[in-house]
């Protein structure tokens, strides 16, 4: 009997013939970006994160072309006019969108695409094309409030508005394929990784 040696649960041949789109969504401050970076670090040959387009200004430490493609409102409108965006959303006064060309670019590399996007965007994509939707949730509303406060990126009325929006987002969790409670980062990552491995081996016939 021939032995099959498996160094990775992800098959390059399977990724090339059957590339998938994963969407990961969560209220602000829950840890979705950190979890995706952990996944990319361990399985860089299997996955790549899509780079969204946004009109908002870069935050401290963000790198244009790596974290986001930062554009003006006029440039964003031109993308809409050309129907270049698979999905887009207007959120807190700024626009965010995902380009189908960006997803296809990742697929052409023989990798699965991972889009870390707003909940509205994830549900819209799900209605238009096959995708695996994952929702990252906080362990409690109190913990969500604490994490939002610790971010320090919003103050006063902005933080209140962000919290109210986050509570609305939590109510949409049951519309996703998977829900992960991020109470412990390492445990949440183990669950996330198991989902990706299971989806890699899902029978699509």
UniProtKB/Swiss-Prot annotation:
SMART domains membership: GuKc
Enzyme class label: transferase
Kinase is among the record's keywords: yes
One Gene Ontology term, aspect cellular component: cytosol
Guanylate kinase-like domain span: 19-197
Highest taxon above the source species: Bacteria
EC number from the UniProt entry: 2.7.4.8
Location in or out of the cell: Cytoplasm
Binding site for ATP: 26-33
Key words of the record: ATP-binding, Cytoplasm, Kinase, Nucleotide-binding, Transferase
Family: Belongs to the guanylate kinase family.
UniProt-listed NCBIfam families: guanyl_kin
Protein name: Guanylate kinase
Gene from which this protein is expressed: gmk
